[in-house]
């Protein structure tokens, strides 16, 4: 059964940024939320779930990339994605906190996500590697264990919001919740602040992490390290670290998906008579047999010598394109010998030239 395009469901273009995707989702969620639709709630619930699913995919960079490349198959397990993707309304707490009020205190205290740009070479991208990175980030304060309070003192519940971290404001027919100004949304009041973190609950540090790079990554891929972002405020969850991959340009190979292309020069004699030619791979050098009469542009394929497929294992190929190198700086003797050789050749030695000039002659007649 055919499935609707996610971009069509949200009414957005394929190049829409994340901010506009969220905006479109909010607008549609307000319109089709079952609690706001009086008639045909069953249809409204179906429509709302469809909108939820579209937003869950398009708001996630990795899922969106898989969907853009493979369509619905990319997020249904056919292209290496996890099979049976589930969609729960609990994943939309931040947005519904904005629309209908609410949102957990723990969510408000969550640490920020971080990004680290990592440059690797083509061989590391092809075969996978593990690298160590050093990042500056906020870590939970060891002195106060993240409470922000001076050791030996206690953290008090905010009297304004009763520890909820939010206050409710009536706006017309709607009751809207907003972060409490008295405690900055934490639900707590500190009487004596920690001398180490000055009441923040976090301190700035440098942290070294080992990042496993899977074989087959390419520029634009990113790796998520859960909980390795900024520390949460006063018991809040830590954010995530996103490692953005950049693959350096190679001196010999040009990458196309999982295949590697290179151009291999061969001399005139080898092209005419045939012979062995040494060609590169990412690991070593190999010899290929060039048959007599090889023309420039002929492709030779070295199977499974390319890049590991990121999604389903196996490897691509190395494809060598031979290029006939015309000799230069010839001596007078060499030129004479070459001219004699040319004079000795007949039409049967140059079938493509004869065919071309024959067609050209008939064209002008």
Swiss-Prot record:
Residues at which Zn(2+) 1 binds: 141, 144, 194, 197
Cofactor note: Binds 2 Zn(2+) ions per monomer.
Annotated residues for binding of Zn(2+) 2: 158, 161, 180, 183
Superkingdom assignment: Bacteria
Zinc finger (CR-type): 128-206
Record's GO cellular component terms: cytoplasm
Any one GO molecular function term: ATP binding
Assembly description: Homodimer.
Protein name stated in the entry: Chaperone protein DnaJ
Organism expressing this protein natively: Vesicomyosocius okutanii subsp. Calyptogena okutanii (strain HA)
UniProt lineage: Bacteria, Pseudomonadati, Pseudomonadota, Gammaproteobacteria, Candidatus Pseudothioglobaceae
Gene name, Swiss-Prot/TrEMBL: dnaJ
């Amino acid at each position: 059964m055919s499935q609707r395009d996610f971009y069509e469901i949200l009414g957005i273009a394929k190049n829409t940024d994340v901010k506009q995707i969220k905006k479109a989702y909010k607008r549609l969620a307000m319109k089709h939320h079952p609690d706001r639709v009086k008639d045909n709630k069953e249809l409204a619930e179906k429509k709302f779930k469809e909108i939820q699913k579209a937003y869950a995919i398009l708001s996630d960079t990795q899922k969106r990339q898989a969907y853009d490349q493979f369509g619905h198959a990319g997020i249904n397990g056919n292209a290496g994605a996890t099979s049976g993707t589930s969609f729960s309304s609990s994943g939309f707490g931040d947005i519904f906190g904005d629309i209908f009020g609410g949102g957990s205190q723990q969510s408000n205290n969550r640490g920020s996500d971080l990004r680290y740009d990592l440059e690797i070479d083509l061989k590391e991208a092809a075969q996978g590697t593990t690298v160590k990175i050093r990042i500056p980030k906020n870590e939970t304060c060891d002195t106060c264990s993240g409470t922000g309070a001076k050791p030996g003192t206690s953290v008090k519940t905010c009297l304004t919001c009763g520890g909820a971290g939010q206050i409710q404001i009536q706006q017309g027919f709607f009751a809207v919740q907003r972060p409490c100004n008295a405690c900055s949304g934490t639900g707590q009041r500190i009487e004596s602040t920690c001398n180490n973190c000055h009441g923040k609950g976090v301190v700035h540090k440098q942290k070294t992490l080992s990042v496993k790079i899977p074989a087959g990554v390419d520029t634009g891929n990113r790796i998520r390290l859960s909980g390795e972002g900024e520390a949460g405020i006063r018991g809040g969850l830590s954010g995530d670290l996103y490692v953005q991959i950049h693959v350096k340009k190679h001196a010999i190979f040009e990458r196309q998906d999982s295949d590697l292309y290179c151009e291999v020069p061969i001399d005139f004699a080898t092209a005419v008579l045939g012979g062995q030619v040494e060609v590169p791979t990412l690991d070593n050098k190999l010899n290929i047999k060039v048959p007599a009469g090889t023309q420039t542009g002929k492709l030779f394929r070295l199977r499974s010598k390319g890049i590991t497929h990121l999604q389903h294992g196996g490897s691509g190929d190395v494809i060598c394109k031979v290029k006939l190198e015309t000799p230069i700086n010839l001596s007078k003797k060499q030129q004479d010998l070459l001219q004699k050789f040319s004079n000795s050749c007949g039409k049967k030695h140059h079938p493509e030239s004869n065919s071309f000039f024959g067609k050209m002659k008939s064209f002008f007649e």
